[in-house]
A protein has these predicted regions:
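Catalytic cores and adjacent flexible loops of soluble metabolic enzymes
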Residues: 1-253
């Protein structure tokens, strides 16, 4: 499991988490047998090291240096950025980081031949594919997963959004297919329809979710009441039309 609350959930509150909330979110992750913790696009100063692996996301349009306190770099790219992304991954790997490729809008990706012919697949800990606008059905998860398998990737991971309330079903499908890792956030915090709630995923997998329940009670209920996220008409339309949340107001489904 990868807890991406601070990074993806941060779109909701402009990454304005208090230091104590950051530290206690990490502590809940550590105490719940969650393997990866995505600290954001930059490493918060209040995080030094952890017994879980600390991840920083880098966008392909903004390749930058990464804190040595991080263990892993997850490089996010749209389909047209794949060449730059692969080059950057090799550089981050040479710097000693674990590296993940994160394919955004994965259903729109077509250049599978480029991935198939990439000779450095073994540098990746895993390749992620994302349901960026919360439009996938389980059949879409299976289709893309198998395409990536056909390209020669062994460790395949999945990032869900919950616009159509299918983040859980889609993630279960990825797990059944043998996913290396799946993403989730505290209380489903995330833009649009939100993300898969990590506390529900832990329950499904038979892991201890009690630390996250305490965390929700102490911090995330207040964040939810202040900012709001989850199922809404706009989230529904975004998922049905498979479009970015910023374009929903211009769309009639």
């Amino acid at each position: 499991i990868l807890d991406c609350t601070l990074r993806d959930g941060g779109h909701i509150n402009n990454w304005n988490f208090s230091d104590i909330c950051v530290r206690e979110t990490l502590r809940a992750c550590e105490n719940s047998a969650v393997e990866y913790f995505e600290a954001g696009y930059n490493m918060p100063q209040c995080i030094k090291k952890s017994n879980v692996k600390l991840v920083i996301m880098v966008d392909a349009k903004n390749i930058c240096s990464v804190s040595k306190n991080a263990d892993c770099v997850r490089l996010a790219c749209y389909p047209h950025q794949i060449s730059e992304a692969l080059d950057a991954l090799e550089e981050y790997k040479n710097q000693g980081f674990e590296v993940f490729l994160h394919l955004m809008t994965a259903d729109k990706f077509e250049d599978y031949e480029r991935l198939k012919n990439w000779k450095n697949k073994d540098i990746l800990t895993s390749i992620y594919f994302a349901d960026s606008f919360g439009a996938f059905m389980p059949v879409d998860v299976e289709r893309i997963y198998k395409k990536l398998q056909d390209c020669g990737f062994e460790n395949i991971s999945f990032h869900a959004h919950n616009n159509l309330q299918l983040a859980f079903a889609n993630t279960i499908k990825a797990i059944e297919l043998g996913a290396y890792s799946v993403d989730a956030t505290v209380f489903g915090m995330g833009r649009g329809g939100g993300n898969l709630p990590i506390e529900l995923l832990l329950k499904y997998l038979g892991k201890d979710y009690s630390h996250y329940l305490e965390l929700i009670r102490k911090y995330y209920i207040d964040l939810y009441n202040k900012y709001g996220w989850g199922y809404s008409y706009d989230a529904l339309v975004g998922g049905l039309a498979n479009i970015h949340p910023s374009k929903v107001s211009q769309t009639i489904v």
